[in-house]
């Protein structure tokens, strides 16, 4: 009887399909660096570093700390299976931190959620994520971020989904990374799971690539390691090596820190953040430990002051007092718990936001966030990547930021929906406009895109902003106006010489009065802040104040080509001088 039944079980086992990131047609290992050399591996330094960096650093570079895999899937169940190169755990750090993985989902409104997986640590480690729900907007699932082990190497890894589900890997981010060079603490000791390492908490908060070059016991500001760091074009370099330098002479530590900054500055002008030793859990009860902390941080401070006195610009500093790791923030004498990791990440994030001019507001319209509300029409992240490539290869002299009204108007990147192609070609293209519109964007989504490079690396003569209608019904008028004010500040920071024009919210069916009222408030704010306001949408109204349905595609929101003809001239016209 068992012989008869056995084949009946085989199809169930075969109903899974497995995806190997190494077999993707493009690099998919995020937060890695040196992608052209090691993008088909789970390591952190290229092969040519072997014999150049110290043997311990080389061995530790084979650990996958900070690496991640991003993908889309609509699967109701996801499995991850893989093998590792070393021991599963350490006395002070569990298997879930040393050798585990972490999975987060991101829904269509950009909200992150931790996914708990049932795990099994055997020769092949497995994580199983069950009963996955559906997105509120569509049936194409979620974006996922899979974070890899902190203190182990990955031999091979596969992601499994039911055979009737879909999985699509996301290419490596083209954005400039933050590069973190540090010690065991930076590598992730002693987080309970990979995403709780402070560098990864920072990465998740900022949503920039962050390359983790933490090397346990070997974060010593070595010029050989800095040589490879200098090959990476980063938006910020963080040096957090003081915890591995307490046993060196004070003057030597000062010299090392100064030399490290100068070595990086020879190749790059990006900001550099120096971080002091965060302290020991027992430093107030152990006089030797207290003296170690005092000495190494005094040396670090001397280095920073010397750097400042020499006029080396864009070097920043965080002290032990700034970090303020609480007494319950350690697992042992020096390695933070999740509590300590979170504290350090919060403090560093606050400083990084100041350095990179990426503030957070208190309203939802002032907190940058991604979206994926209509993947059946386009992939938002893919369009963002296309924008970055477009402005890099063809620096525009004018840009228009907006939502679907802009997105489906015309221009590049190409899209099958073009509601006003003729008008775009007649008016906007001759005026030099690059279309930076994304369907279903809200104010906070445009803020994310600005923080992530769409206005960087070129000088535009004009910036036109046409956003806010999708915040209707979700935010009150004050939140919308303040969100626009916040957004305009971000635009001015990145395009200080451009003239900036804000287009009033276009009229929409059954909400014409609300549009009139809020445009009055928007106009007042815009002109007070010194920008130009235009309200071409009045041309889309009948004499009774209702929209002219013949000028829209049928939804009472998106203009057709005739509608665009009536508003394009005022949108594209030259702005007043700022």
Describe these PLM feature segments.
Residues 1-16:
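Bacterial Sec-dependent N-terminal signal peptides
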Residues 14, 92-94, 134-138, 142-216, ...:
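Serine-esterase "nucleophile elbow" of acetyl-processing enzymes
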Residues 15-62:
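Glycan-recognition and processing domains
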Residues 58-170, 375-377:
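Extended, charged alpha/beta regions that create polyanion-binding interfaces
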Residues 177-180, 209-213, 236-240, 271-276, ...:
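Structural recognition of the beta-strand scaffold that forms the well-ordered cores
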Residues 194, 202, 219-258, 263-266, ...:
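Oxyanion-hole/transition-state-stabilizing segment in secreted/luminal serine hydrolases
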Residues 206, 210-317, 327, 332, ...:
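Catalytic cores of extracellular degradative/oxidative enzymes
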Residues 278-365, 509-578:
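Catalytic His-Asp segment of secreted/periplasmic serine-dependent ester chemistry enzymes
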């Amino acid at each position: 009887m068992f012989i008869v039944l056995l084949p009946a079980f085989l199809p169930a086992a075969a109903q899974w399909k497995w995806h190997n990131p190494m077999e993707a047609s493009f690099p998919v290992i995020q937060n890695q660096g040196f992608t052209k050399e090691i993008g088909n591996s789970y390591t952190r330094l290229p092969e040519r570093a072997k014999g150049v960096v110290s043997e311990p650093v080389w061995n530790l570079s084979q650990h996958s700390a900070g690496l991640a895999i991003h993908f889309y899937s609509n699967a109701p169940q996801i499995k991850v299976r893989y093998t590792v190169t070393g021991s599963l755990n350490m006395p002070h750090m569990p298997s879930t931190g040393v050798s585990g993985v972490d999975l987060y989902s991101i829904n269509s409104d950009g909200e992150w959620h931790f996914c708990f997986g049932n795990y099994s640590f055997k020769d092949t480690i497995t994580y199983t994520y069950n009963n996955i729900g559906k997105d509120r907007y569509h049936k194409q699932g979620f974006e996922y971020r899979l974070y890899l082990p902190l203190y182990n190497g990955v031999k091979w890894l596969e992601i499994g989904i039911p055979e009737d589900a879909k999985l699509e890997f996301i290419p490596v981010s083209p954005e400039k990374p933050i590069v973190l060079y540090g010690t065991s603490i930076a590598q992730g000791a002693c987080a309970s799971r990979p995403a709780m390492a402070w560098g990864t908490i920072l990465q998740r908060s900022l949503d920039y690539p962050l390359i983790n070059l933490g090397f346990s016991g070997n974060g010593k500001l070595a010029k050989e390691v800095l040589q490879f760091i200098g090959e990476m074009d980063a938006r910020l370099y963080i040096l957090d090596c003081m915890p591995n330098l307490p046993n060196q002479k004070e003057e030597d530590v000062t010299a090392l820190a100064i030399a490290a900054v100068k070595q990086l500055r020879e190749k790059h002008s990006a900001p550099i953040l120096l971080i002091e030793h965060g302290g020991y859990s027992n430093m107030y009860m152990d006089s030797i430990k207290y003296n170690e902390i005092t000495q190494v941080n005094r040396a670090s401070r001397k280095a920073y002051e010397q750097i400042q006195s020499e006029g080396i610009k864009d070097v920043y500093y965080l002290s032990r007092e700034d970090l303020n790791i609480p007494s319950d923030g350690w697992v042992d004498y020096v390695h933070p718990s999740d509590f300590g990791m979170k504290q350090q990440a919060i403090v560093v994030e606050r400083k990084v936001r100041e350095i990179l001019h990426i503030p957070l507001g208190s309203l939802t319209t002032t907190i940058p966030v991604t979206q994926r509300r209509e993947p059946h029409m386009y992939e938002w992240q893919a369009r963002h990547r296309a924008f970055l490539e477009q402005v890099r290869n063809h620096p525009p002299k004018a840009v228009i930021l907006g939502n679907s009204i802009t997105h489906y108007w015309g221009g590049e990147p190409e899209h099958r929906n073009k509601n006003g192609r003729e008008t775009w070609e007649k008016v906007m293209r001759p005026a030099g406009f690059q279309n930076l519109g994304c369907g279903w964007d809200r104010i906070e989504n445009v803020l994310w895109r600005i923080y992530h490079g769409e206005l960087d690396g070129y000088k535009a003569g004009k910036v036109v902003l046409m956003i806010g209608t999708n915040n209707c019904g979700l935010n009150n008028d004050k939140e919308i106006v303040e969100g626009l004010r916040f957004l305009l500040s971000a635009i001015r920071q990145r395009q200080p010489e451009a003239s900036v024009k804000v287009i009033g919210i276009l009229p929409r069916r059954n909400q014409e009065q609300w549009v009139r009222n809020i445009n009055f408030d928007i106009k007042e704010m815009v002109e007070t802040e010194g920008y130009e306001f235009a309200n071409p949408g009045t041309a889309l109204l009948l004499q009774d104040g209702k929209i002219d349905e013949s000028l829209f595609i049928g939804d009472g929101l998106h203009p057709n080509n005739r509608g665009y003809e009536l508003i394009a001239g005022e949108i594209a016209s030259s702005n007043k001088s700022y």
